[in-house]
Regions:
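Carbohydrate-associated surface elements
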Residues: 137, 159
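Conserved donor-binding/catalytic core segment of Leloir-type glycosyltransferases
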Residues: 166-185, 191-196, 205-209
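Glycosyltransferase donor-sugar binding loop
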Residues: 203-230, 246
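Short alpha-helical donor nucleotide-sugar binding micro-motif in glycosyltransferases
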Residues: 247-248, 255-260
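Conserved acidic donor-binding segment of nucleotide-sugar-dependent glycosyltransferases
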Residues: 300-316, 325-330
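Short hydrophobic beta-strand element within catalytic cores of glycosyltransferases
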Residues: 285-288, 292
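Membrane-proximal helix-turn-helix segments that form the acceptor-binding/catalytic region
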Residues: 103, 112-131
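Aromatic "clamp/platform" in nucleotide-sugar-dependent glycosyltransferases that forms part
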Residues: 268
């Protein structure tokens, strides 16, 4: 079987830049190779999706150096902002694009930037032979918003690594939110919800990178989103009960999961939510928004039970109410923990995820053979 070139962000192995996308890319590459579909990672450094001229040229040279007809899978963070580079390459390579998150869905973007991302991404995906999304919800959304043939948009959901059951703290009080501190992940909503429950007994860990924010050209500097979240916590008098860890390595993150009683993910947009599966793999119930694919990721168990609580996206009042229910109802907590442990047994492996990706890559190789046969 010939090798697929997998172009990924250069940050894929950087412990200071953990992300669900990087973890997905690395695990899929590893397990695809084990499944007999060789994948060669090609990491490219760059400020993707907004590369410098030199970074854009480096991507162009990497693509130009591949023989005609080479099957190439490109992470959407690298691909979707540079249609001027990807579209010409797609004319001679067998190009697939893996979309972790539509670029325009990242929170905090100005309208004109979001519109530019949408146009660029659409041009790239329409040029590609195949598109891979990380959930059924995301695949349907991508096909609709970019007017793609749904038959070319494939779903490859992430897998989950096995993990020990989390002992927790006291079964109720320790909350864990694992996400980069950005508007899309909704930590401002969580801060407000916690403030409305300040009389309850709890602590919260917000584990994830604290991205910097560039000031507008010629404009005044403003607090980062993380600083604004901290300010809100301070107004409620609860800043000392919330710990921001910054980016964590695997062992440190395992330690935070082990102490967690409830995982909270109040995202405004989400194409999958791998940290939800990672919590459920440890038997930790989840309080999540209903954004995007999160209801699918949280899932259900026997009797239609949900292994956690779902609230409307962007609704701090609903989030506060759900937290109040969690702390105020011991029977509810027992039931949710039991459902989370049942869901744990149903989570799929990365081997299964890689098998799905292998089927897409086989189609990509078949596209190559068909193209060669028409010459």
């Amino acid at each position: 079987v010939s090798t697929t070139v997998f172009i990924v962000p250069g940050s894929i192995g950087d412990p200071a830049a953990p992300s669900g996308g990087n973890r997905y890319d690395r695990r899929i590459a590893e397990e695809s190779a084990r499944a007999g579909m060789p994948v060669r990672e090609l990491p490219l450094d760059g400020a993707w999706p907004d590369p410098s001229g030199a970074e854009r040229a480096r991507l162009s040279r990497a693509l130009d150096g591949l023989p005609d007809g080479t099957p190439v899978l490109v992470d959407g963070l690298v691909a979707c902002g540079v249609p001027d580079v990807l579209a010409p390459a797609a004319a001679r390579l067998r190009l697939a694009v893996l979309v972790h998150l539509p670029l325009a869905d990242e929170g905090g973007l100005r309208a004109e930037r979001a519109e530019a991302y949408e146009r660029a991404e659409g041009a790239v995906l329409r040029a590609a032979v195949r598109v891979v999304a990380t959930s059924g919800h995301a695949a349907r959304d991508i096909a609709r918003r970019h007017r793609l043939d749904p038959a070319r948009v494939h779903t490859v959901e992430p897998g989950t690594d096995r993990a020990p059951l989390a002992p927790g703290t006291d079964g109720a009080s320790r909350l864990l939110c694992v996400a980069a501190v950005t508007p899309r992940k909704g930590q401002d909503l969580l801060a407000e919800a916690l403030g409305r429950n300040r009389d309850r007994r709890w602590t919260c860990v917000m584990a994830g990178p604290l991205p910097s924010e560039a000031a507008s050209p010629g404009g005044p500097s403003r607090p980062t989103f993380a600083e604004r979240v901290e300010e809100r916590l301070g107004r409620h008098g609860i800043r000392d009960r919330v710990r921001f860890t910054g980016a964590l390595g695997p062992s440190a993150l395992d330690g935070e999961f082990a102490c967690a009683d409830l995982m909270v993910l109040p995202s405004r947009a989400e194409t999958y939510g791998m940290v939800v599966s990672e919590a459920l793999a440890r038997g930790v119930p989840v309080l999540a928004s209903g954004a995007g694919a999160l209801p699918e990721t949280v899932g259900r168990v026997s009797g239609g039970r949900v292994p956690g609580l779902l609230v409307p996206s962007g609704d701090a009042s609903a989030l506060a109410g759900a937290l109040g229910r969690w702390w105020g109802d011991g029977a509810l907590r027992v039931g949710l923990r039991a459902a989370a442990r049942e869901r744990r047994a149903l989570l799929r492996s990365w081997r299964s995820a890689a098998a799905d990706m292998a089927r897409v890559l086989e189609l990509l190789h078949g596209d190559r053979a068909a193209a060669e046969g028409t010459r």
